[in-house]
Amino acid sequence: MASQGTKRSYEQMETGGERQDATEIRASVGRMIGGIGRFYIQMCTELKLSDYEGRLIQNSITIERMVLSAFDERRNKYLEEHPSAGKDPKKTGGPIYRRVDGKWMRELILYDKEEIRRVWRQANNGEDATAGLTHIMIWHSNLNDATYQRTRALVRTGMDPRMCSLMQGSTLPRRSGAAGAAVKGVGTIAMELIRMIKRGINDRNFWRGENGRRTRIAYERMCNILKGKFQTAAQRAMMDQVRESRNPGNAEIEDLIFLARSALILRGSVAHKSCLPACVYGLAVASGHDFEREGYSLVGIDPFKLLQNSQVFSLIRPNENPAHKSQLVWMACHSAAFEDLRVSGFIRGKKVVPRGKLSTRGVQIASNENVEAMDSSTLELRSRYWAIRTRSGGNTNQQKASAGQISVQPTFSVQRNLPFERATVMAAFIGNNEGRTSDMRIEIIRMMESAKPEDLSFQGRGVFELSDEKATNPIVPSFDMNNEGSYFFGDNAEEYDN
């Protein structure tokens, strides 16, 4: 990316900061993380959670969801204007799990949103600290990415379910700002645009009037975000055309689907950050760690070090495998749902198995499940090595890939071949280069066809020992390229239903 100079780093996006040097960025990210930790400790006190209960990931998620709900201005306004029976728009809550007489019990709690906002602001030096809220949203998004597949959503917008590696961040709310946009995959943004265009086709007034003007601005902004993720001139030129269209319709939808497919080989830049559950930050703050003074980075060694010495528990359903539950949460913590399993496994120091072979469902527990039958176990979130998270798609080459997911979106900046099944991807392009963008389409297809098998991505980049904090001695792993590398291969993951 030659244009690096014009971009803010993700940490700056994350903290809403202007240009800062590395030390300032580390300090402001640290301030954000410390605020989340202080908030979590205060909530545990208010809810009278024991130390053990405070380390339960399900409790962490409930507390996180409560603060997100308390600050969701739009929804709060909507709820007040459209009162629904039995819902108090001023309150938020969820299940809290407590250990009573050797058994887990579920307790549904309700809290004033105003009270939660007060605790949050108090933990964040009186500020709204939107960066911290976005950080929590990204953690939830990463957890969804590792837990569910989005086949139905892909099919509904006319995309191919095998394009799931492009769907990072597909459950992130619109209000997640620049930091949220940075972690969204090409397919996610293409899908948001397709939905807008479809509404415009069905509703004559969608682009008209004062509202329509705002809609148009949002449309063009989203086009620019997607354009910025592409790394080739032809893909970007095609995005310009989609953006400039007077009256977006089926031609634009076709172009977007074409571009999304092309990203399976000509990968887009998608940021990856390790966002951990609030209880992990709470534990560190409680043990006296000063995040702001020490500084923190979401893309370096810090999250790995934090997870090395945090003990987090999870409720386990009777037929679930605790090791598999740990893998799911580990992948979510490092935003590695679409990473090559061989790379993840090498870094983690344990075999990482595809989603279809995991004996575990999601982390959250439905209100109709019987909690008393459940046990809790420690999540194994430690790693053998650490690696720098990437914000680029890496260059491409050809490898055997799978029947389910046919490409990867790298998370870790580690030298490897990037697998994709050229025959499968290219089959989708046959005979579809009609229309006004034909020359760009031809150019993109030509680039895809000439993507070389032997090109290594992230040349010379490796993983590091956990003692190597300054990343001085890269270890470049060698991978067995005959093994399956896709997580959603031949998959039976549950669908994400909001």
From Swiss-Prot:
Short sequence motif Bipartite nuclear localization signal: positions: 198-216
Keyword RNA-binding: yes
Record-level Gene Ontology MF annotations: RNA binding; structural molecule activity
Position of sequence motif Unconventional nuclear localization signal: 1-18
Record has RNA-binding as a keyword: yes
Modified how: Late in virus-infected cells, may be cleaved from a 56-kDa protein to a 53-kDa protein by a cellular caspase. This cleavage might be a marker for the onset of apoptosis in infected cells or have a specific function in virus host interaction.
Free-text function comment from the UniProt entry: Encapsidates the negative strand viral RNA, protecting it from nucleases. The encapsidated genomic RNA is termed the ribonucleoprotein (RNP) and serves as template for transcription and replication. The RNP needs to be localized in the host nucleus to start an infectious cycle, but is too large to diffuse through the nuclear pore complex. NP comprises at least 2 nuclear localization signals that are responsible for the active RNP import into the nucleus through cellular importin alpha/beta pathway.
Protein name from the UniProt record: Nucleoprotein
Organism listed in the record: Influenza A virus (strain A/Swine/Ontario/2/1981 H1N1)
Name of the gene: NP
